[in-house]
Structures are given as structure tokens and as C-alpha cells.
Amino acid sequence: MNIHEYQAKEILRKYGVPTSTGLVVTKTEKINDTIDKLNTEVYVVKAQIHAGGRGKAGGVKVVKSKEEAKKVAHDMFGINLVTHQTGPQGQKVNRLYIESGCDILKEYYFSIVFDRSASCITFIASTEGGVDIEEIAEKTPEKIIKFSVDPATGLQDFHMRGIAYELGFKDNQAKQMKEIVKSVYNAFIETDATQIEINPLIVNSDGNLLALDAKITFDDNGLFQHPNITAMRDHDEEDPLETRAANAGLSYVKMDGNIGCMVNGAGLAMATMDIIKLYGASPANFLDVGGGADRERIKEALKIILSDKEVQGILVNIFGGIMRCDIIAEGIIAAAKDIGIKVPLVVRLAGTNVEKGKEILSNSGLEIIPAHDLADAANKIVEAIR
């Protein structure tokens, strides 16, 4: 789960991370009053959307008067902001964060993430802040600093000293950086986060370190322990189909292709998407129905796939282990009769009760195209939509 910048800063402040401060606006009629409450010489108006690249897209504006701030805020609120992360459709700006500006002497990058490949927690830092870490990695990879933390032993003093040293901090600034590392680590662990990113972390004119922008992503599986964080969820920032799928216990991610996929198991789902690409088409989604899906969940999965107007065909690829193929077949038939599937539907079944499942589909009277293996299924669905 993602949250907005102002929410991320609120959490980090609770853990002792110094951040820039401001006020959030959720209604246009509150803009003027909110800006009047800020007593500052420089105003920073920031669009609050769950995507990076806001600055380059015009979603962050720095102005030097209240009147300018009010005009910029009114112009920005409600626009469709298009960044390199939103896609061409953009994201509507329903919230603004208006901050007091500050002098910036130097910008840094600092984050903490789970490194699944190394089975550890990793700090990533750089003396080049204010730009995407991917851009730093591409242009100046030697400027990226990494420190790994063993979850069994936790954060140690040498981690904090090492990060401060590698970033070039000395004396009081080194002490500040050590405290920030400790605070961010504690926030990461205690909130079940998967990533905390501060970009940029700045040194201001007073020589103090300050988190000027912040992003936190949480592990959905840990949210039940954090109702206060769950309450920060902004459903307007999420794809409605993905939200609907999550509520039904389905793992769904919308993509840009035209072949809908329904699969059980994340690995099989990715293999299915790969082979669709191999045969010359593109998947419209990732959809894992899980190992314990029943008829109703299968029906809901197909309804979600067909809610995407770009879908021209559907490939169902099920390996029956825990899930029985006859249950899948009954769910497919129920969905087809209920919603009227009008696009080509290719079904590949294997595993538990596969012959019974195939028999149910064959006797259904519906126009379902059977496939005997994954390659056959991919070939048939691609040919069917041409």
C-alpha cells in the first residue's frame, strides 16, 4: 500500500526524522484559508498523487507570495497530472500539500528497502539527490552507496557511521545523519514497510539535515496490525479494478495489453504472460486466483477481466493442485452464463480432476476453446483475436 507524501512525513516525524512542514488541502474552497495560515516568505505547492516525477511534470511549484501560491494552487487542484510513472492517462490531483520553502545547500538520496535477492534489509544512499535513483544508477553508478542489515542482528552502530561517512558528513551533520538512519530503520521495522525513500534529503542554510520529500510503501500482509496506517489509504489513487479484486481475495494488476489472463499461482501467471508476448500479443492483466478459489471467486475474476474494455480475448491457465479443475470449469460456465462472455475464451486445464473439468466444459454448450498445453493455449488465443 502506498500513501501520500504528507502522510509519509507525518509518520517519519513521529519517529524523530526532521522534515519540512506544511498543510494539506483536500477541497478547493479551503485553499486560500490554508495558505493564509502559513507564515513564510516562500511557498511550495505540491500535487499529492501516488507517482514520482511530479516536479518535472509541473506538480511542484515554488512561489514567493501568498497571491501567487493561491493562484498556483487553484490552477493545480483537479488537473490530470501526467508523469513518467502515471502512464499517458495521468492521475487526477485531489489533494495538495503546501509547504514553507527553505534554502537548499546540498541534496542527497536516502532510502531503505527489502532486498529479496540477498534476504536482508538494504540502505541505499547517494550524494546525488533530487533525481530518480534509476537515473543515478544509469549515469553515475559509482555514486550509489549500499549497506545491508541482517534482520537477525538488526541495525548496528557501524551501519550508521558508515552511511554518514560515505555521504561525506562530519561532526554535527554526521551525528544528525546517524540519528536519521536509526529513526528511518525503526519506522521501517515497526510499520511493516517495504520501502522508505527520502529524496531529497537536504542540508539547509542552517547546516541541518531535513527530509524534503518522502515516500513510504507498506506490506499489505502486515496492514491488519496497523489500523492507523490502513486508514491513510486513498482509494482514489488506486485502480478500481485492483481494489475490487483485492476485496475478492484476488491478486490483480492491470496492464496495457488485450488478452485477459486468469491463472492460479504467481509463477504460472508470469509464465503465461511471457508466452503471450512470445506469440505476438500482450497481456491485459496479471490475475492470480490463488490455490483455494471457489466458483464465486472464479466468476468474480472473469467479471473483473471483462470490466477492462481493452480485453479482446481471455486465456485461462489452471494447474489443479489444491484447486480442482472441475471447480474451475463450473466457475467458468457460471460466469459465462451470468455475464455473457462475448470474446474468445481459451481454457487450458491440468492436474486434479482434469478429465472431469474438460468434460464439464465440453458438455456446457458454450464456445470455449480447449488447449492441451500452455504453448497451444497461447497460440490459440492469439489466433482467435486476429
From Swiss-Prot:
One example GO MF annotation: magnesium ion binding
SUPFAM superfamilies associated with the record: Glutathione synthetase ATP-binding domain-like, Succinyl-CoA synthetase domains
Catalyzed reactions: succinate + ATP + CoA = succinyl-CoA + ADP + phosphate; GTP + succinate + CoA = succinyl-CoA + GDP + phosphate
Pathway assigned to this chain's UniProt record: Carbohydrate metabolism; tricarboxylic acid cycle; succinate from succinyl-CoA (ligase route): step 1/1
Domain ATP-grasp stretches: 9-244
GO terms under cellular component: cytosol; succinate-CoA ligase complex
Listed cofactors: Mg(2+)
Binding site for substrate: 264, 321-323
Keyword annotations of the record: ATP-binding, Ligase, Magnesium, Metal-binding, Nucleotide-binding, Tricarboxylic acid cycle
EC annotation from Swiss-Prot or TrEMBL: 6.2.1.5
Pfam assignment, any one: ATP-grasp_2
Highest taxon listed in the record's lineage: Bacteria
Presence of the UniProt keyword ATP-binding in the record: yes
Residues that, per the record, bind Mg(2+): 199, 213
GO biological process per UniProt: succinyl-CoA metabolic process; tricarboxylic acid cycle
Broad EC category: ligase
Stretches assigned to coiled coil: none
Keyword Ribonucleoprotein on entry: no
UniProt cofactor note: Binds 1 Mg(2+) ion per subunit.
Positions that bind ATP: 46, 53-55, 99, 102, 107
Functional summary from the UniProt entry: Succinyl-CoA synthetase functions in the citric acid cycle (TCA), coupling the hydrolysis of succinyl-CoA to the synthesis of either ATP or GTP and thus represents the only step of substrate-level phosphorylation in the TCA. The beta subunit provides nucleotide specificity of the enzyme and binds the substrate succinate, while the binding sites for coenzyme A and phosphate are found in the alpha subunit.
Family: Belongs to the succinate/malate CoA ligase beta subunit family.
Quaternary organization: Heterotetramer of two alpha and two beta subunits.
Name the UniProt record assigns to this protein: Succinate--CoA ligase [ADP-forming] subunit beta
Species: Rickettsia massiliae (strain Mtu5)
